[in-house]
C-alpha cells in the first residue's frame, strides 16, 4: 500500500488525505448532531488534529509542488498532525481502559477553561483527560469511538508516509 501511495503525485496524495479527513470529520459531526453525543475535551483535540491535517493536505493539493522539498514539507507536516491525533486518540483509549477507581475526576468544561485559564494550562488539562473522556458511548464491531478514531489516524498517517516513501523511491 505504501508503494502505491508513493507513486501518487503530491496533489493526488493530498486529495486522498483531504478525503480521509473529511470522512473522519463527517463521522464526528454525525455522531454529535444526529446521535447527540457531546464531544469530550480529548474528542475536540482529535478534531483539531484532523482539521490541522486537512489544512495541510488542502494547501498541498492547491500548491502541488513539483520537487521533493515541497513533497517532503507537506508530507512531514501532515504526518506530524496525524501523529498528534494518533497520540491524543491513544490517550483517550487508555483512559477508557482504566478501572473506574483510577479514572480522573471530571473537570470544568472546555468553554469555561478557555475563558479563565491561559492557553498552556487549558492544553495540559485537556490532554490529561477527565472522567467524561473515560465514558464509553457504545461500540461498533466491538470497538469504541476512540478506538475507531485511533485506527482512522493510523490509516491517515499512511498517506504522508507514502508521500515520503515516494521521495526515497525517486532518488534511487
UniProtKB/Swiss-Prot annotation:
Residue intervals annotated with topology Cytoplasmic: 1-13, 66-72, 167-172
Main location, first listed in the record: membrane
Gene3D superfamilies: DsbB-like
Residues spanning the membrane: 14-30, 49-65, 73-90, 148-166
One Pfam family named in its UniProt record: DsbB
Residues in the Periplasmic compartment per record: 31-48, 91-147
Subcellular location: Cell inner membrane
SUPFAM superfamilies noted in UniProt: DsbB-like (SSF158442)
InterPro entries named among the record's database cross-references: DiS_bond_form_DsbB/BdbC, Disulphide_bond_form_DsbB, DsbB, DsbB-like_sf
A GO cellular component annotation in the UniProt record: plasma membrane
Source organism, top-level taxon: Bacteria
Cysteine pairs bridged by disulfides in the record: 40-43, 106-133
GO BP: any one term: protein folding
GO function term, MF aspect, one: electron transfer activity
Membrane topology note: Multi-pass membrane protein
Sorted UniProt keywords: Cell inner membrane, Cell membrane, Chaperone, Disulfide bond, Electron transport, Membrane, Oxidoreductase, Redox-active center, Transmembrane, Transmembrane helix, Transport
Function summary: Required for disulfide bond formation in some periplasmic proteins. Acts by oxidizing the DsbA protein.
Family to which the UniProt record says this protein belongs: Belongs to the DsbB family.
UniProt-recorded name of the protein: Disulfide bond formation protein B
Lineage of producing organism: Bacteria, Pseudomonadati, Pseudomonadota, Gammaproteobacteria, Oceanospirillales
Amino acid at each position: 500500500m505504501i508503494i502505491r501511495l508513493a507513486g501518487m503525485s503530491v496533489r493526488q496524495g493530498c486529495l486522498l488525505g483531504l478525503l480521509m479527513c473529511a470522512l473522519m470529520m463527517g463521522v464526528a459531526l454525525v455522531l454529535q448532531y444526529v446521535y447527540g453525543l457531546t464531544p469530550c475535551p480529548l474528542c475536540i483535540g482529535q478534531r483539531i488534529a484532523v482539521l490541522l491535517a486537512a489544512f495541510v493536505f488542502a494547501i498541498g493539493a492547491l500548491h502541488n509542488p513539483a520537487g521533493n522539498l515541497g513533497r517532503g514539507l507537506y508530507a512531514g507536516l501532515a504526518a506530524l498532525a496525524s501523529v498528534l491525533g494518533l497520540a491524543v486518540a491513544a490517550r483517550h483509549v487508555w483512559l477508557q481502559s482504566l478501572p473506574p477507581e483510577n479514572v480522573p475526576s471530571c473537570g470544568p468544561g472546555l468553554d469555561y477553561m478557555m475563558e479563565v485559564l491561559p492557553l498552556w494550562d487549558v492544553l495540559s488539562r485537556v490532554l490529561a483527560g477527565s472522567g467524561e473522556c473515560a465514558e464509553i458511548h457504545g461500540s461498533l464491531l466491538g470497538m469504541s469511538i476512540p478506538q475507531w478514531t485511533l485506527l482512522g489516524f493510523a490509516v491517515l498517517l499512511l498517506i504522508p508516509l507514502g508521500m515520503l516513501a515516494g521521495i526515497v523511491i525517486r532518488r534511487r
